[in-house]
């Protein structure tokens, strides 16, 4: 069975047992009345069952309802169909004041019907020939308004300075000021020029997201013809069907696939309604993607440490034990489904590098947009500063130093022999984003 953990807030006067019992049939075989066609099938075989209800500690009138769904309810290899059933009509149910899907347990019998990520972590490292450290990226800014040639110039400067990747912002598709084909051409030129000068394999996340699946695949085909290593998709706004189609194309044609989660906070930010990001992360691992944005813990975007690391490990690891302290409601066995690299992006700069290296480890992408392009000396020096800071943190960690305790000292030591890093340290020494996370247990 697929197991689901729902946070249920019943309407006043509705017992939690009744609310939990209402969720199970509405998201499986039930309707509001008995119908004569019920007798033409075996409802006991197909109906969802609420098998346990427990109160949420510290919250009034909130309960976790556990529901089991038989696998025969779901089409194989379709995240779209799975979500249509589990989170379809039930969220509008009048007996419920609010409902949130906290977690899913996907059994191997179902997860094995999915291709999953086009390539996975190990294959990506082999393609890039980069090991033993996090990968470095940068989102090109301003996100909208640049011409294709100036955009390509910024890509080249960042890659030449030492970054592994640059990125289209999620908003960048094919607008009047920069059509997609022009952007792809200038970015490919920037990649090849930077590779020739540095001797390293480089990439730019070319956003293939489009208004139709046919147009999306056309853009991915052109990227493949240019010989670039990676494309990008906005998987929530683009949709799971489109994402799975693109993931299949990417595996068949040797392209890595970077996933942006634009629109996720509409779904996952409210504590008692919607769907937790760990569910969206599991769905993405099945639908397919080699990278996905996962918050930073220390930057400008939402993310509490233990909860963030809970779904980061769900993306990377083959097997994860139930751990309620990290928000993981079920033991999850991914069997041989490839892993996904978490991307830390949003309001981060060189002073965050020790914490990011310590929190996310080697199998991650650390992405500095303003933290690269905002360098007072320009884009390439901004990239140099980030690469020097990363190499210093990795070396210090490998020598046994404590990044959490000695991080600032490690950055100061490195800045003594890197003027680019010293300038970055001076610019961003006072920048902090200290707001309380909404996503707490």
Swiss-Prot record:
Residue sites binding Mg(2+) per the record: 167, 169-170
InterPro entries the UniProt entry points to: RuBisCO, RuBisCo_large_chain_AS, RuBisCO_lsu_C, RuBisCO_lsu_C_sf, RuBisCO_lsu_fd_N, RuBisCO_lsu_N_sf, RuBisCO_lsuI
Cofactor binding summary note: Binds 1 Mg(2+) ion per subunit.
GO cellular component: chloroplast
Reaction(s) catalysed (UniProt annotation): 2 (2R)-3-phosphoglycerate + 2 H(+) = D-ribulose 1,5-bisphosphate + CO2 + H2O; D-ribulose 1,5-bisphosphate + O2 = 2-phosphoglycolate + (2R)-3-phosphoglycerate + 2 H(+)
Record-marked site positions (Transition state stabilizer): 300
Entry keyword Metal-binding: yes
Keywords, in A-Z order: Calvin cycle, Carbon dioxide fixation, Chloroplast, Disulfide bond, Lyase, Magnesium, Metal-binding, Monooxygenase, Oxidoreductase, Photorespiration, Photosynthesis, Plastid
GO MF term list: magnesium ion binding; monooxygenase activity; ribulose-bisphosphate carboxylase activity
Role according to the record: RuBisCO catalyzes two reactions: the carboxylation of D-ribulose 1,5-bisphosphate, the primary event in carbon dioxide fixation, as well as the oxidative fragmentation of the pentose substrate in the photorespiration process. Both reactions occur simultaneously and in competition at the same active site.
Summary of subunit composition and partner proteins: Heterohexadecamer of 8 large chains and 8 small chains; disulfide-linked. The disulfide link is formed within the large subunit homodimers.
Protein name per UniProt: Ribulose bisphosphate carboxylase large chain
Protein source organism: Fouquieria splendens (Ocotillo)
């Amino acid at each position: 069975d697929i197991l689901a953990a729902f946070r249920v807030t019943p309407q006043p006067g509705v017992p939690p047992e009744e609310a939990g019992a209402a969720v199970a049939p509405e998201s499986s075989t039930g309707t509001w009345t008995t119908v004569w066609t019920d007798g033409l099938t075996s409802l006991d075989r197909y109906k969802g069952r609420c098998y346990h209800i427990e109160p949420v500690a510290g919250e009034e009138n909130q309960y976790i309802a556990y529901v089991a769904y038989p696998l025969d309810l779901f089409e194989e290899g379709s995240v779209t169909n799975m979500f249509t059933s589990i989170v379809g009509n039930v969220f509008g149910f009048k007996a419920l004041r609010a409902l949130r899907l906290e977690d899913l347990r996907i059994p191997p019998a179902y997860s094995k019907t999915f291709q999953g990520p086009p390539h996975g972590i190990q294959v990506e490292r082999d393609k890039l020939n980069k090991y033993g450290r996090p990968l470095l990226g940068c989102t090109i800014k301003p996100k909208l308004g640049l011409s294709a040639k100036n955009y390509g110039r910024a890509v080249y400067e960042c890659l030449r300075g030492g970054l592994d990747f640059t990125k289209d912002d999620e908003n960048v598709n094919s607008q009047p000021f920069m059509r997609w084909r022009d952007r792809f051409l200038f970015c490919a030129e920037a990649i090849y020029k930077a590779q020739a000068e540095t001797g390293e394999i480089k990439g730019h996340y070319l956003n293939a997201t489009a208004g139709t699946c046919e147009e999306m695949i056309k853009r991915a085909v052109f990227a493949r013809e240019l010989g670039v290593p990676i494309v990008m998709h906005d998987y929530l706004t683009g949709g799971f069907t489109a994402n799975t189609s693109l993931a299949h194309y990417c595996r068949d044609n040797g392209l890595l696939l970077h996933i942006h989660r634009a629109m996720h906070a509409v779904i996952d930010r409210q504590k008692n309604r919607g769907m937790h990001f760990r569910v969206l992360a599991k769905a993405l691992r099945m639908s397919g993607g080699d990278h996905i944005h996962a918050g930073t813990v220390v930057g400008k975007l939402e993310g509490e440490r233990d909860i963030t690391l809970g779904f980061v490990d769900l993306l990377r690891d083959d097997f994860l034990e139930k751990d309620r302290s990290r928000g993981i409601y079920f033991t999850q066995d991914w069997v041989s489904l490839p892993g996904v690299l978490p991307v830390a992006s949003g309001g981060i700069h060189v002073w965050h590098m020790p914490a990011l290296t310590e929190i996310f480890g080697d199998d991650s992408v650390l992405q500095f947009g303003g933290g690269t392009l905002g360098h007072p000396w320009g884009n390439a020096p901004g990239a140099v500063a980030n690469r020097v800071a990363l190499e210093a943190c990795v070396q210090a960690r490998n020598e046994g130093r404590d990044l959490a305790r000695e991080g600032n000292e490690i950055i100061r030591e490195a800045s003594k022999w890197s003027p680019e890093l010293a300038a970055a340290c001076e610019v961003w020494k006072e920048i902090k984003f200290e707001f309380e996370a909404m996503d707490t247990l």
